[in-house]
Structure formats: structure tokens, C-alpha cells
């Protein structure tokens, strides 16, 4: 354990003692709540809300609130929170990451802090890793909250903005990290206050926090729209590179000549083209110099084509389905619906596979998950800020330092409810991969013969299919669970603990379903009640009454098989390869031995595994030559075991550095994002922009005058050029001659005098413009102009910042720190953008030809869509009265181009949603009591599809 980790764990005992005290407090009052009727229990929610409003803090209410939820869960779900679950709930409320082993009931733990924090009325977000879990948990755990009188919402990929707004208005909202993040970004692209769906970021509980905040933190959430790009080159280069040969790098010092046309570094995932390759490409394309500035884009196409050929392997990194290239997640082995590689990489792979090549996209809005989750802040009664983020996972201690450094989150390991008795066997290492899989199949066959349930973990779809073929040859019945079959997933996992079952799965990280020995009684009981026509949503009371008996019957059925499986040694987890991260290995192991059940785990490795090949190549070669053992005999070697551990920590450190680096660079953009989004929000909130436009005008005029009069005497100033600039800005009425006359002569002019005179003139022209258009239209024009210019400038700025970041690494060669340079230049670009926004806003305001359309009646949205609950109305911004709708050439219309969403996905399901937004009305715009804007929004929402 590193020194840093030890320091991290220094205060652990103190926190655990505090959590024990809280659990004891809750236990001491448990009986008082058991005697209450359902109605009395429900009435407590309003009482707590009132006490909070009267000045009590949430910490004061904690013991009673937890006892209330414990009693409600007992009545509605037939599950009572264990003491360790109460401790976990308290840790979450205090803003920690609670490390709870698999099968300790993390989902149930979330109900405690969610209920407590919902009492403040600010909203609680519970973040899961995929849509299936969000829906399942909001339905299952939502029963407890609904029983206590709170309303629960769930954000899913295909909802319309009106539905989303209603879900966010609920006390507790479930959803995936991507949906929460995209809604934040879309809110900051909204054209009016009525389009906003979120109501702030108060408190978030993140399930599988390590997957979301660590594994996926390197990939930002991006909303992009189409950019102009020539697609013909991708196809041409895909054909070209098939004629180039891979070779090795040369070394002039050792006199080794380079071979082939290009070299590939698998470890760094880079390629480099050799002289011979360049010559061939120039020859084939008929150009003189590939590296001339005019040919720069071609170098990018060439590099991407080589990478697509060498580094991106079909059925490992991506699959081709229905003529589309789909990325496979390296962590979970699932298909990432709709996610595309950027920088033209995806197009290069499409060209390689010969499928349709889609357009490249330009970033319109972006945020990393790290910065999104740092938005969550709670405020106590005195307005003091407290962290609003917490999370739970089975494996967090290995990343404790990272949680602390980046999110300021402490990690608390919560003890298990029953002691752990799983046997973790030592690794078996084989010389070749073929021999390893032979041994794996032998082991599976032997264990299967006696009936022990087996779960096999593989690292890629390819390997799980290879193993499946081997098992079929031996006649072993088994289930395969990988990226290609999402739908049956939960059912397969729930039954993976039955006698004689064999389940082969790509990374099981974050699958969220418990493997219970002998089968899952909850699933059986639920199926029985649904067959009888009951629904937990509609028949809350009847469901609660019928559940205990159904559960008992299901448990009896499962119990006999459970005892049998227990005798056989419980679930056997077999890993066929070590993952890059120790944490994912531990997650796989953790599927077995839950709640004190027996279990066993073992990893089979070979010296040809990716991890060993990439990080410990020389050492592997040494062992191979030393160990003169036949292929089918495992190598027992301390050195190899140590090498594996060191390779894993090497990869982890490397990934942590990458994430820290991403964050440092995004930090620069984050501060800029806060300024721009804050500005946008003020415009949307309907703040009167008159004063702001005044500031914009004054600043622009000062800048113009300053630029022209900074040097020389008044006689030297080029006032004609200055007036030319003013004329482009607004219709100038005052002339140079008038000013000279007033000042006596040219020499009497001062910069201040010119600036003041022009400002007075602008004010007059502004008032004249307002009189001509009418003040209401003028206000709407200001709003639209500022939003339109702000958005366009921010889009251009994001593009520039991307471009800057790509090349900034080269500054290191000039002995400069790339990050410092990026901060400095990024700040200069931001200043230039802000000046541009001011200047263009003023210019547009005076020079646009405005047409006023008919007045649009703004119908309060709650009338348009049936509301879940009266409480939902608070969050719906209904704008009274009518607002003029205006059109002007050069002003963005409040519709979106085709938008594309790209985000990390922990579990494939969250994927990426691709938007196709229509330009005008939906085809049937029947009069349905909605405004045009809302009908358009509904059309947008309805057309979103998952790919």
C-alpha cells in the first residue's frame, strides 16, 4: 500500500465510529416507527419538510428520516435495511464514496440519503450506469418513496423536453450520467426559458461511482453538429494503405535501417510513416511534396487510414452491424450505440470496411463528466456550501487518492453484513493462449460435471465467442453474454447462480444484477404477481399486501437448490485474462461470495495476453527461454505474478495521469464555460439587456478609439478610418468636422472627447431604433441577437481551443510548459471572443432588417402536458402574456441543425443518442393547445432515435 493510500485511510476508523453511532441511534428508535399505521408513516414526510423549513438541519433529521425509510422498505419491498446499509446511507449523506461489496444491497442504501435530501425540496439525482438500471431502480426503489409521499422521476433517452422537465421537477430523479450531462448542455443551448428542463444541481448519488467518475472520466460529453468535410479522400486512402507494408523503425546509431513503409507502436497507439511510404503516396497521388502546407489535411487522412488498418481490429475494437461501424467498449465489452471516434478516425474505419461514410461533426457544446459532477453543491440554512456529490461502488479503495484529488471525495469502506468466505486461488500462467483456453475448458467441464455454477469473464467479444465454440465442441451447455445481446442480459445474470449453469461474459463491470445462488426469488415472486394482473405502480396497496406471501413461496422453491449449490462450493468465477485495472478484476471476483455465501475464484493467464505483451515484453521473453516447460503445464513463478501486478499498476498510473491531464486542460475551458453559460442564463431569465447592450456599446467604442488614437498627436490620427469603422457598427450621424468645430481645431481633439461624443450619438440612434421598432420588439431583438452571437462565437471558440490543444504539446520542445502556454493562449482567445461578442451584438442590433411575425401566445406548459403531480408546476417556467416572434437575415433561427451526441458509456446502454431535429413544424400541426415552439420541441423529442 502506498504512503498516499495510508494517509488517505488515516481517518477511516473515526468516520466508521461515527457511522456506527448513527446506526445505533436509528436502531434505538426503530420500534416506535413499527407501531405507526401506513397513513401516519406517510404523514411524517410533511412533518420533516416543515421542521426543515423552520430551521432544523438535515443532519438533525437524519436518524428519524432513516428509520422512516427502513420501516417503509420493510412494508413495501419486504426488505429491512441492515445496520451496515444504514451506515452506508449516512456515509453518502455526508458526501463520501461508500465502498460496499457486491451483493450488500447498494441500491437499497441509496433510498436513505435520497429521501433525506429530498426533504429540502431542491431535488436529488440518482445516477446509474444504464437506462435499464435507471428504469428498474426508479420503479423498484420508487415504490418506497411514493409510499412516503414523494414523487420519483426517471430520465430516459427517448423522452421529449416536456417529459424531462416533469421528471426533473420530481423530488428524486433517476437517470444515467449521459442523460444528466446532455440535459445540462442542451439547457445551455436553449433559446427560451421555457425550453430549460433542469432545475439545478443540488445532490447526486452516483451508483458504480468508480466506473462513472474514473473509467469514463477521460471521455468528454460532446454535442456536435455537421461540419463541411470531403469524404472522397477517406475511400482513396483506405485503398492506398493496403499497398503499403508495415515495417520496423531504424536506428542510425546502431546502424539498423528502417524497413517497410511505416511503423506501428501498439503500446502508445501511434503510427509513423517512413520515407519510402511518403514517396509511394506522393507518387500515387501525383503530388510533389506531401508535407507542403496545402497538403496538410492529406497527412491526417493517411495517418488515420494506417491506424484504421493496424490499430483498430474488427470484433475487438468495433463491430459492423447493418452496414454501420459500432464501437465496442474496452471496459465492458458492450456496443456503444451511436458513439463515433472523432478526428476523422471513424470515417477512416468506415472506408476500410467499405460501408457508407458519414459526415464529420463540429463541437457545439462539451463538458467532461469530472466537471459536470463538480457542479453539484448543497447549501445549508446559512447559505454555506457543502459538497453535493456522493457515490457507492464495490471497489473504490484502489482509487481513493484519485477521488480525493479530483473530486475532494473521501472513501469509506463499509464492513460487510456477514464475513466473506470466498476462496481466491492463485493465478495459473500458461505459455500460450491456446494452451490457456484448453485448461480453462477442462476446468469448466470438471466443475460443470458436479453441478457447480460457473461464471467466466473474458476481455473481448472475440474471446468470449472463441471460448463458446470450444465449450460447444465438448457439449457443455452454456449462456454467452456480450455486447451483441443486451436484451436477455438481466435474465441470464439473475439465473447464473443456478445449479449447473455456465455463463460466459465479457467484462461484467456495472451489470447491476445480483447473482444469487439457486436463482433469484425476487424475480420469481414479481413474475407471479404480474401474472395475477397486479402492477406495483398502479396497485401500490394490493402489491404490498400480496408480496410477502409470494416471496415466501419463491424462497421455498429456491432454498432447496441454494443448499445444494452451497454444498458444491458456491459460484466459481473464472477469469481468462487480467484486465488493465485491478479494480475490474476485483469486480469480477466480487460476483462470487456475496452475503457470506461460499465461492471460489481463479484467473488463468498466458504470456501472450495483451497486458503482458504490451507492458512486460522483455520479461516474458526471459521467462519463456528459462522455463523449459511444455505448453499444457502452468508456470508457477513469483516473478511472473509480480510482473503482472506491476504491469497493472503501471497501466493504472498511466490512466490516472491521462485523466489528470484531461482535467487540467478542461479546467481552463471550464472557467470559460462558467462565464459564457452564466451570461446565457441571465439572457434567458429575461433580464433586461438594455443596460448590458449599453456596456457592450461603450466597450466597443472605447476599443475602436483606443486602437486608432494610441499613438501620435491628433493631427496624425486617421479619423476617416475610425469613422469608417463606426459606420459599419451603426448609422453615425455626428461628423469629424462637427467635432473639430466644437473643439476649436483638430489639435484640440482628445480620445476621451471623441469617445464621449460617439457614445452620445449611439444613445440617440438606439432610442430612435427603439421608437421605430417598439420597445417590446427591441427587447426581444436584443435577447435574440445576444444569444445568437454568443452561441456562434462560443462554437468558433471551442473549435479554436480544440485546435490549440492538439498542437500545444510541441511547445515542450521549446522548453515551455504546454499547460501554461495553453492557459495563456486560451485566455487571450477568450478575451478576443468576448470583445467579438460585444462588437457583433452591437452591429447586429443596429443593422439587421427586422420582420415581426404574429404575436405568439405562450401557453403555460403545465396546461399542455398532463402533470405528474401538482409539485411539478413549480419548475415549469410559464411566461405570462405574449412575446413577439421576429425574423432577421443573419440571425440564427431558434431551431437546431442536426445534432449528434457523443459521450462515454459505462455500460453500452447509455450509449449516445443521435438527434435529427426538423426545421419547421411537424407534419401534422393540429391545434392541440400548444405554442408553435412547443410543437416544434415535441417534434424534436419524438424524432430522437437510438442507434
Curated annotation (Swiss-Prot):
Alphabetized NCBIfam families for the sequence: PRK12904.1, secA
Tree of life domain: Bacteria
Compartment(s) where it occurs, according to its Swiss-Prot or TrEMBL record: Cell membrane; Cytoplasm
Gene3D superfamilies xrefs: Helical scaffold and wing domains of SecA (1.10.3060.10), P-loop containing nucleotide triphosphate hydrolases (3.40.50.300), SecA, preprotein cross-linking domain (3.90.1440.10)
HAMAP family referenced in this protein's UniProt entry, alphabetically: SecA (MF_01382)
Membrane topology term: Peripheral membrane protein
Function: Part of the Sec protein translocase complex. Interacts with the SecYEG preprotein conducting channel. Has a central role in coupling the hydrolysis of ATP to the transfer of proteins into and across the cell membrane, serving as an ATP-driven molecular motor driving the stepwise translocation of polypeptide chains across the membrane.
Protein name stated in the entry: Protein translocase subunit SecA
Species name: Streptomyces lividans
Pfam families attached to this UniProt entry: P-loop_SecA (PF21090), SecA_DEAD (PF07517), SecA_PP_bind (PF01043), SecA_SW (PF07516)
Principal location: membrane
Keyword terms, alphabetized: ATP-binding, Cell membrane, Cytoplasm, Membrane, Nucleotide-binding, Protein transport, Translocase, Translocation, Transport
Gene Ontology MF terms: ATP binding; protein-exporting ATPase activity
Miscellaneous remark of the record: Restores azide sensitivity to E.coli azide-insensitive mutants, but is not able to complement temperature-sensitive mutants.
Signal sequence segment: none
Comp. bias regions, Basic and acidic residues: 884-900
Region of interest: Disordered: 864-947
Enzyme Commission number: 7.4.2.8
Protein transport as UniProt keyword: yes
GO cellular component entries: cell envelope Sec protein transport complex; cytosol; plasma membrane
Oligomeric form and interacting partners: Monomer and homodimer. Part of the essential Sec protein translocation apparatus which comprises SecA, SecYEG and auxiliary proteins SecDF. Other proteins may also be involved.
An annotated GO BP: protein targeting
